[in-house]
Amino acid sequence: MQIEVEKLTDFSLMKKVVKHVFNLDTRASLAKWYNSEHSPIRTQLFAIFAYDVPYSVCMQMRTHDKNGALFLIESGRPDAYGSDRVKSQSGNYREQPRNIFIMCNAQHLIDWSHKRLCGKAEKPTREFFSLLKRQIANVDADLAKMLVPKCVYRNGLCTEFKPCGER
């Protein structure tokens, strides 16, 4: 599994939006904005290219597309697009890893991390999101610090019916 992340916008856009919408010249750092989780952080957009992602992880991540993020998942059907990669795979197409593209904002990533870094998440999903967090750190270290399991976010309070006991 491999993940590449591109940050599509920068802090200057967020400052311009804050000035335009709220008539404020913000002096707060990007880290402070991420910590506040106020709506302007949604101006920080990311393109994520993930390769050979387990099918189960693709499907778990896809559950997050209802909040405005874009998810495009490589088809596993041998009759779709005539891909040599797909044609070379034999057996149940649901067992084959997929390439996935995600376009999302900073708030999406913060919200998803609460579930996907949780000890109750499937191990391959935690591995995927841990790798994603490391790649996010390469383009936005302030955001990467905010990507934590919900129990960390809530200072040790776990809201799962059966806590994992990690914290």
What are these regions (language model features)?
Residues 1-167:
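Family-specific signature for flavin-dependent thymidylate synthase
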